[in-house]
C-alpha cells in the first residue's frame, strides 16, 4: 500500500527526525539537486562562491553538501516557482478582504439574534484577541523565513505528519468556501431578480468565469485587483460604522436617539430558550455566539499563504500583520458594538430574517437603516454585499490553489499540482479548485440558506483548527530558537507575549473548538446535522495526522534538530536590498516634496 502512495507524490517518505541531517531528509527529500537550473542563481542574484554553494550535483550526505541544493528559495525550478509580486499593501488587503464578507455583514444578525448585543460584543472581542495572538505568531515565523503555506511551517518545525494534517484540513476548507460564496452571490441577486425569472445557476456561472479569469492572469494583477476591491470594502465598512453611529445618536429621519436603550430592554443578553432561562440560558446563548464570530474572522490568517509571493516579506509581512490587527478593532468591534445599540435582538424585522437567504434583507445593517426611516439605502447596501461576496470568493479561490500548490511542493500532494505557468500561477491546482466550485450548482435550491449555515459550521471548525496548528507550530518554533541560542531581538518581527501569548490562545482555541456546538445536546431533539457539520473537522484532522504518521513513521523533530537556517541567508540579503531601496525611496520622496506618493505612504498606507 505504501509504494503506490509514495509514487504519487514528489517525495519519498520522510524518515525519523532524530538529527539535523534526518530533518533535512524528512523535509527536503523531494528536492533533487539535479533539478535546479543554473539560471536560478541569476534570478536571486546569489554569489555561489560567497554562499559556499559550489556543487549542486554533490551526492554527499553531509549537511553542508546537502544545503548546497537549497540556495534557491523553496527549492523550486522555473516551472514550479511563484512570482514575488505582492507588496505590503496587497498582502494586508488580501487578508482583510478575505475575512470581510457575509460573516460580518449578515452573520452578525444571527449572532445578535442568538445571544444579544453584549454577548455578541464579548464573543467578537475575545475571538479577536485570539486572532491577534495567532496572527502575531504567524507573522514572526513568516517574516523570519517565508515558506509556502502552513503545511511547510508545520513540516519543518514540528512534524511532517502535522504538516499533512493542517495542509489537507485547510485545503478542504477552501474547497468548500468558493462554491459557498458563489451560492451566496446568487442569493444576493435574488433581492432584485427572483429565481423564477432567472435561474441562479446563470449568476453562479458569470461570477465563476470572472473570478477564474482574475486568478489565471497572475498574482500581480490579482493583488492589484483585490487591493482596490478590498479598499472599496474598507470604505463601505467605514461608511456603515459612521452611519450606525449617526443613527444611534438620533441622526436618522425619525430622529430617535437610541443610546443604550436596547441594552436595557430587551436586555444585554438573551436567554437561550424557554426551557433554558436565567443566568444559565444567557451563558448558553453567549457560548453559541462563538460559532458566528469564528466564521466572521475566518480567512484573516491568509497572510501565511501569500507571504511566499511577497516582495521583501520581512518588511511587508509584519506591516500587514499590524494593519490587520488595527482593522480587527475598527471593523469588527466597532461594528458589533454599534449594531447592538441600533438593533434589538427581538426586533420583528430581525426575527423575520431568520432562515432567509443571504441577501440584504437578512442583514442587521438593513434592519437598522429601515428602522431609522431611510428608504433607498437597502438597495445600495445589497450591491455592497454583492461586492463583498465577490471579493471573498476571489480570495478563497486564490488560497485554495496556493494551498494545494504548497502541499505539492512539500511532497504531500501529486507533483503535477506544483507546476506553474509563465505568470507564476499554479494552473493545475487552480483547475482542481475550480472544479470544486461546481458544488455551488448543487446548493441552489429552496433550502440553500440552511445549507449555507451548515457550511458555516464546517468552515468554522476548519478555521479554528488552522489557528490551533499555527499556535502549536509557533510554540515549537520558539522552543527551537531558545534551544539553538537564536537571538530574537534581531528578528524583523517578534510576537507580543511570545510563547505565553501562544499558550493562552491555544488553550482557548481548543476549548472553543470542543464546545462551539454543544447546544445540539440541549434541545428536545438531537440535531444530528448541526453536530456532524460542526465537528466533522476534528476526525478529518486527527485521521489525517495519525494516518500519515503510521504510514511514514514520522517523529516530532527535536528542538536542537529543527532547521532554522536553510534559506535564511537569502532572505537576509533580500532584506538588506529592500532596506537600500527604502532609503532611495525616502530620498526620492523628500526631493519630490509632499506629492500623492508621500501622502499615501504617510497616511493612506496605514488605512489601505
UniProtKB/Swiss-Prot annotation:
The gene is DIP5. The chain crosses the membrane at residues 91-111, 120-142, 157-177, 202-222, 232-252, 286-306, 323-343, 373-393, 424-444, 455-475, 502-522, 531-551. Present with 432 molecules/cell in log phase SD medium. This is Dicarboxylic amino acid permease. Its main location: membrane. Keywords: Amino-acid transport, Isopeptide bond, Membrane, Phosphoprotein, Transmembrane, Transmembrane helix, Transport, Ubl conjugation. It comes from the Eukaryota. GO terms for cellular component: cell periphery; fungal-type vacuole; fungal-type vacuole membrane; membrane; plasma membrane.
Amino acid at each position: 500500500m505504501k509504494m503506490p502512495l509514495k509514487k504519487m507524490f514528489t517525495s519519498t517518505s520522510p524518515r525519523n527526525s532524530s538529527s539535523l541531517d534526518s530533518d533535512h531528509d524528512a523535509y527536503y527529500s523531494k528536492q533533487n539537486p539535479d533539478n535546479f537550473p543554473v539560471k536560478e542563481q541569476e534570478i536571486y542574484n546569489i554569489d555561489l562562491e560567497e554562499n559556499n554553494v559550489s556543487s549542486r550535483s554533490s551526492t554527499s550526505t553531509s549537511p553542508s553538501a546537502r544545503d548546497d541544493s537549497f540556495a534557491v528559495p523553496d527549492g523550486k525550478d522555473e516551472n514550479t516557482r511563484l512570482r514575488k509580486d505582492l507588496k505590503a499593501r496587497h498582502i494586508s488587503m488580501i487578508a482583510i478582504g478575505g475575512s470581510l464578507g457575509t460573516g460580518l455583514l449578515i452573520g452578525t444578525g444571527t449572532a445578535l439574534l442568538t445571544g444579544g448585543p453584549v454577548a455578541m460584543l464579548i464573543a467578537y472581542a475575545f475571538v479577536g484577541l485570539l486572532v491577534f495572538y495567532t496572527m502575531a505568531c504567524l507573522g514572526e515565523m513568516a517574516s523570519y523565513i517565508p515558506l509556502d503555506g502552513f503545511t511547510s511551517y508545520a513540516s519543518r518545525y514540528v512534524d511532517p505528519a502535522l504538516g499533512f494534517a493542517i495542509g489537507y484540513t485547510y485545503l478542504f476548507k477552501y474547497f468548500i468556501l468558493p462554491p459557498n460564496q458563489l451560492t451566496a452571490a446568487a442569493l444576493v441577486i435574488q433581492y432584485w431578480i427572483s429565481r423564477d425569472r432567472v435561474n441562479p445557476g446563470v449568476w453562479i456561472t458569470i461570477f465563476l468565469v470572472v473570478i477564474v479569469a482574475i486568478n489565471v492572469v497572475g498574482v500581480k494583477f490579482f493583488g492589484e485587483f483585490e487591493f482596490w476591491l478590498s479598499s472599496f470594502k474598507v470604505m463601505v465598512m467605514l461608511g456603515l460604522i459612521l452611519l450606525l453611529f449617526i443613527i444611534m445618536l438620533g441622526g436618522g429621519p425619525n430622529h430617535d436617539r437610541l443610546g443604550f436603550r436596547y441594552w436595557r430592554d430587551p436586555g444585554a443578553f438573551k436567554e437561550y430558550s424557554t426551557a433554558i432561562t436565567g443566568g444559565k440560558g444567557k451563558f448558553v446563548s453567549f457560548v453559541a455566539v462563538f460559532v458566528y464570530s469564528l466564521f466572521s474572522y475566518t480567512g484573516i490568517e491568509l497572510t501565511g499563504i501569500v507571504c511566499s509571493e511577497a516582495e521583501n516579506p520581512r518588511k511587508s509581512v509584519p506591516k500587514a500583520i499590524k494593519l490587520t490587527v488595527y482593522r480587527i478593532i475598527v471593523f469588527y468591534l466597532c461594528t458589533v458594538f454599534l449594531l447592538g445599540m441600533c438593533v434589538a435582538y427581538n426586533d420583528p424585522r430581525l426575527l423575520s430574517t431568520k432562515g432567509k437567504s443571504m441577501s440584504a434583507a437578512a442583514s442587521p445593517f438593513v434592519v437598522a437603516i429601515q428602522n431609522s426611516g431611510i428608504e433607498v439605502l437597502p438597495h445600495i447596501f445589497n450591491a455592497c454585499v454583492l461586492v463583498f461576496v465577490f471579493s471573498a470568493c476571489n480570495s478563497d479561490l486564490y488560497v485554495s490553489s496556493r494551498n494545494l500548490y504548497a502541499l505539492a511542493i512539500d511532497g504531500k500532494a501529486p507533483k503535477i499540482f506544483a507546476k506553474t505557468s509563465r505568470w507564476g500561477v499554479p494552473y493545475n491546482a487552480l483547475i482542481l479548485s475550480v472544479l470544486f466550485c461546481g458544488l455551488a450548482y448543487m446548493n441552489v435550491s429552496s433550502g440553500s440558506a440552511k445549507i449555507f449555515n451548515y457550511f458555516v459550521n464546517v468552515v468554522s471548525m476548519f478555521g479554528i483548527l488552522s489557528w490551533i496548528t499555527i499556535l502549536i507550530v509557533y510554540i515549537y518554533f520558539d522552543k527551537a530558537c531558545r534551544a539553538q541560542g537564536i537571538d530574537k531581538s534581531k528578528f524583523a518581527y517578534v510576537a507580543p507575549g511570545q510563547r505565553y501569548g501562544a499558550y493562552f490562545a491555544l488553550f482557548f482555541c481548543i476549548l472553543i473548538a470542543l464546545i462551539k456546538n454543544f447546544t445540539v445536546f440541549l434541545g428536545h431533539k438531537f440535531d444530528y446535522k448541526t453536530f456532524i457539520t460542526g465537528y466533522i473537522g476534528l476526525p478529518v484532522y486527527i485521521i489525517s495526522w495519525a494516518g500519515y504518521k503510521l504510514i511514514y513513521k514520522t517523529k516530532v523533530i527535536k528542538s536542537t534538530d529543527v532547521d532554522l537556517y536553510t534559506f535564511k541567508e537569502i532572505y537576509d540579503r533580500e532584506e538588506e536590498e529592500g532596506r537600500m531601496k527604502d532609503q532611495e525611496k525616502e530620498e526620492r520622496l523628500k526631493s519630490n516634496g509632499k506629492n500623492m506618493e508621500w501622502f499615501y505612504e504617510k497616511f493612506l498606507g496605514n488605512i489601505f
